[in-house]
């Protein structure tokens, strides 16, 4: 089972507030430096990495001399605004010592619920990762409201794992993993090393709330693992203060709690595509494109499309039919119907000259395509 960790090519690492602060007295630069050293080693080993970092509110509280996390939204947002600057500067400085750059991305629930903004965020993250930059993601606490907040960065990290199609979500916390009883009260409590994310028995042992500086307890981490599992990602809940924790995970050590999805990534994603989205338009393909989809598992390129029917936006589901009108596949369009009308029948390298930009070389990528 741990081969799923050692073989994972794309990690989302989430670090909680309790780990990032020095007893509530500002950011723990020493601890951050140790994690950065390990994350740089992961990058150099070929692992694509996205960091979800808590700590903005906690850092701001320290600057303001507050010892208790405020409940008023305006005070939380003020602390986040002050602390976010220091948090990002600390990450950039630490990664910079190893010749790596970071990029700040602040998200709200609206960014991931709106399909167009979701696709734009995914495209930006993929580009940053391809460039060797480490994206540092946090919730945009300064502008978010109760109605649209993620609630905790565990949930945000799971949604980011879905967004970037990560193989592995690593949630670093102040506990060594999930136990079959509360280890703070029961010295006989045993660490749960491996389980299915959807195992209902886990709910009984995941009680409890977050600490003074954060919002997420073990129950939120379990929910995050289940959310990540929807796209086929594995989740490890593990103690962030374990020595060389990321190095040892990569080496295959049996640490923390590994929660596995029911299905593999591609199977989970394609089941979701097949059953959960309403179709908005139709693409009529030529015989060559039909053969490429059915026999070679290829993406659908504009050159293989003869006509566009219906009205759809980027990211919406379209039906792909052959010259005989029989449905071949369905998938998510990378371009709107109006844009698709302009580029069909054309080679992919002509997209930019026709539209003035190029979002993707494919009209529908094979990972977003389900054969029927």
From Swiss-Prot:
Say which domain of life the source belongs to: Bacteria
Question: So what EC number does this one have?
Answer: 2.7.2.11
Q: What top-level class of enzyme does the UniProt entry assign?
A: transferase
State whether keyword Zinc applies: no
Which reaction is this enzyme known to catalyze?
L-glutamate + ATP = L-glutamyl 5-phosphate + ADP
> What residue stretches are annotated with the PUA domain?
280-358
Keywords tagged on the record? Amino-acid biosynthesis, ATP-binding, Cytoplasm, Kinase, Nucleotide-binding, Proline biosynthesis, Transferase
* S-S bridge residues: none
Binding annotation for ATP: 14, 173-174
Question: Which pathway does it operate in?
Answer: Amino-acid biosynthesis; L-proline biosynthesis; L-glutamate 5-semialdehyde from L-glutamate: step 1/2
Keyword Amino-acid biosynthesis on this protein? yes
The subcellular localization recorded is: Cytoplasm
Can you tell me which family this protein belongs to?
A: Belongs to the glutamate 5-kinase family.
Protein name as it appears in the record: Glutamate 5-kinase
The upper taxonomy is: Bacteria, Pseudomonadati, Pseudomonadota, Gammaproteobacteria, Pseudomonadales
**Name of the coding gene:** proB
């Amino acid at each position: 089972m741990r081969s799923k960790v050692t073989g994972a090519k794309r990690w989302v690492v989430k670090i909680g507030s309790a780990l990032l602060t020095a007893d509530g007295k500002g950011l723990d630069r020493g601890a951050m430096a140790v994690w950065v050293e390990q994350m740089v080693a992961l990058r150099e080993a070929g692992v694509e990495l996205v960091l979800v970092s808590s700590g903005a509110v906690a850092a701001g509280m320290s600057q303001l001399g507050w010892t208790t996390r405020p409940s008023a939204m305006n005070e939380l947002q003020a602390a986040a605004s002050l602390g976010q600057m220091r948090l990002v500067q600390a990450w950039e400085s630490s990664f910079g010592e190893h010749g790596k750059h970071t990029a700040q991305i602040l998200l709200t629930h609206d960014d991931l619920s709106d399909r167009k903004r979701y696709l734009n965020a995914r495209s930006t993250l993929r580009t940053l990762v391809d460039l060797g930059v480490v994206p540092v993601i946090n919730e945009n606490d300064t502008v978010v409201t109760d109605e649209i907040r993620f609630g905790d960065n565990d949930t945000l990290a799971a949604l980011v794992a879905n967004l970037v199609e990560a193989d592995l979500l690593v949630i670093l916390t102040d506990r060594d993993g999930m136990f079959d009883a509360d280890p703070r009260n029961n010295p006989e409590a045993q660490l749960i090393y491996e389980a299915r994310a959807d195992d209902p028995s886990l709910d009984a042992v995941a009680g409890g709330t977050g600490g003074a500086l954060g919002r997420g307890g073990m129950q939120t981490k379990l929910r995050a693992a289940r959310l990540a599992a929807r796209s086929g990602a594995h989740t490890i809940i593990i103690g962030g203060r374990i020595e060389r924790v990321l190095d040892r995970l990569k080496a295959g050590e049996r640490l923390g709690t590994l929660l596995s999805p029911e299905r593999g990534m591609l199977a989970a994603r394609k089941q979701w595509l097949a059953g959960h989205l309403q179709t908005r338009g139709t693409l009529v393909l030529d015989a060559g494109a039909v053969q490429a989809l059915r026999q070679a598992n290829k993406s659908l390129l504009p050159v293989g499309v003869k006509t566009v029917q219906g009205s759809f936006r980027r990211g919406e589901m379209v039906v792909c039919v052959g010259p005989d009108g029989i449905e071949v596949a369905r998938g998510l369009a990378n371009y709107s119907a109006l844009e698709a009308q302009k580029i069909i029948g054309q080679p992919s390298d002509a997209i930019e000259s026709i539209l003035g930009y190029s979002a993707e070389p494919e009209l529908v990528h094979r990972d977003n395509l389900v054969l029927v």
